[in-house]
From Swiss-Prot:
It is found in: Nucleus. Pfam families: Forkhead (PF00250). Residues 13-22, 83-107, 323-334 have a biased composition (Low complexity). The keyword Transcription regulation applies. The gene is Foxd2. Residues 47-59 have a biased composition (Basic and acidic residues). SMART domains: FH (SM00339). This is Forkhead box protein D2. Residues 60-74 have a biased composition (Acidic residues).
């Protein structure tokens, strides 16, 4: 080892003790001063020169000689100082890299701080579902259409073109759109026209569901729309409380409480047990056809309901006063005309039988009260001449009888008062007090009039013999009154 190298090693150990603080540090100087030597750090620092590794100090003569040589060669060893300071710069560069190293590192690799995401990462992120319900989406699609109606496929096409989320998941939500169209009352189905070919029906909005969304915002819906039932065709201006109660019961869920507006009224426009007014004034129409019977027309005019009498059926006439007599109608009724081509019947038998039956039916109910005065005077004499025949006596009928005529079944003949019959005991032909006295001569009609005008409960002066010229056919038999006792007091 030369003296110069020793001197440089001593100076470097004194000037940079921190750089050589590690144990067993060794610095080799390669090359001379002019050659630009290189300093290399070894595994451990080297001990200073004054401390020998073998543990003995050099002699003082050698130490002085070394100091002198160092002073002489101080100029030549000046280039050793930068080489001695080089490890300090290298250590600093190794501890904290300079700005150039940091710039190089930033160019080669990404920094530890967060950076903006690239475009590929944004496309891989999932799409956000729109905050609208299916009802709102359907309403949007229908409102934007020109005719305000769309089919199911057109609604799905609008939603897919408007929102990318539904475009990617198209097959999944199509059934939800179909269910909302069918289950919500705010959507109305319109059948397709016959001349408009295609598949599916049209869907539109109910006119009453315009305020379904709050302030026109599709994000908030006020309430579920319910379609109201149609009102009756002719609502009553002032409904009866009974009808209101029926309507409330029907709304409460009682199906039997609700009655239609027309079924709530009877056949004559009145309620069952309630005097309800009619719905309104009847429409003006033609006047009812006048009925030939004046009483029936008056009854139809005074009826509480506006009903017309059917043409084939006449209304029953109102009951008359109790004092009216049935003979008034009999007097006003025309006499039955005989059949054409037939001669007058003997003694008017057919007409008499019909008149007798008619008078017998109407006489007894009306005979309970005394007839009105002057009623019998209006009795037609033609009826008496045609239907009544008085018998002049029991023997007179038997003398003029013919064998080929029809026998009579009158009460007098059955009682045995015909021709040849014996009179009941205690009753003579000329007895005026007997009810079975025969009407003699032309006074028989007067007795008939007297009987008709007299009260029904008073006995008549003479009995009318309604007999026939053929009474003699049965007169040969025994008398019926002779076998039965106590029949003398019977009027008929």
């Amino acid at each position: 080892m030369t003296l110069g190298s020793c001197c440089c090693e001593i100076m470097s150990s004194e000037s940079s003790p921190a750089a050589l603080s590690e144990p067993d540090a060794d610095i080799d100087v390669v090359g001379g001063g002019s050659g630009g030597g290189e300093l290399t750090a070894r595994s451990g620092p080297r001990a200073p020169r004054d401390v020998l590794p073998h543990g003995h100090e050099p002699p003082p003569e050698e130490a002085e000689a070394d100091v002198a040589e160092d002073e002489e060669e101080s100029g030549g060893c000046s280039d050793c100082e930068p080489r001695a300071l080089a490890p300090r710069g290298a250590a600093a560069a190794a501890g904290s890299p300079g700005p150039g190293v940091q710039a190089a590192r930033g160019a080669t690799g990404p920094g530890p701080g967060p950076g903006p995401p690239s475009g590929g990462a944004a496309t891989r992120s999932p799409l956000v579902k729109p905050p609208y319900s299916y009802i709102a989406l359907i309403t949007m699609a229908i409102l934007q259409s020109p005719k305000k109606r769309l089919t199911l496929s057109e609604i799905c096409e609008f939603i897919s073109g408007r929102f990318p989320y539904y475009r990617e998941k198209f097959p999944a939500w199509q059934n939800s759109i179909r269910h909302n169209l069918s289950l919500n009352d705010c959507f109305v189905k319109i059948p397709r026209e016959p001349g408009n070919p295609g598949k599916g029906n049209y869907w539109t909005l109910d006119p009453e569901s315009a305020d379904m969304f709050d302030n026109g915002s599709f994000l908030r819906r006020r309430k579920r729309f319910k379609r109201q039932p149609l009102p009756p065709p002719h609502p009553h201006p002032h409904p009866h409380p009974e009808l209101l109660l029926r309507g409330g019961a029907a709304a409460a869920g009682d199906p039997g409480a609700f009655l239609s507006s027309f079924a709530a009224y009877g056949a004559y426009g009145y309620g069952y047990g309630l005097a309800l007014p009619a719905y309104g004034a009847p429409p003006p129409g033609p006047a009812p056809h006048p009925h030939p019977h004046p009483h029936a027309f008056a009854f139809a005019a005074t009826a509480p309901c506006q009903l017309s009498v059917p043409p084939g059926r006449a209304a029953a006439p109102p009951p008359g006063p109790p004092t009216a007599s049935v003979f008034a109608s009999a007097a006003s009724a025309p006499a039955p005309a005989p059949a054409p081509g037939s001669g007058p019947s003997p003694a008017g038998l057919p007409a008499f039988l019909g008149a007798e039956l008619g008078c017998a039916k109407a006489f007894y109910p009306a005979s309970l009260s005394p007839p009105a005065a002057g009623t019998a005077a209006s009795l037609s004499t033609a009826l008496l001449r045609q239907g009544l025949k008085t018998d002049a006596g029991g023997g007179a009928g038997g003398g003029g009888a013919g064998t080929g005529q029809r026998p009579s079944f009158s009460i007098d003949h059955i009682m045995g008062h015909g021709g040849g019959g014996a009179a009941p005991p205690g009753s003579g032909d000329g007895s005026p007090g007997s009810p079975f006295a025969a009407a003699a001569g032309p006074g028989g009609q007067a007795q008939v009039l007297a009987m008709l005008t007299a009260p029904a409960l008073t006995p008549v002066a003479g009995h009318i013999r309604l007999s026939h010229p053929g009474d003699s056919l049965l007169s040969s038999g025994p008398s019926f009154a002779s076998k039965v006792a106590g029949l003398s007091g019977c009027h008929f």
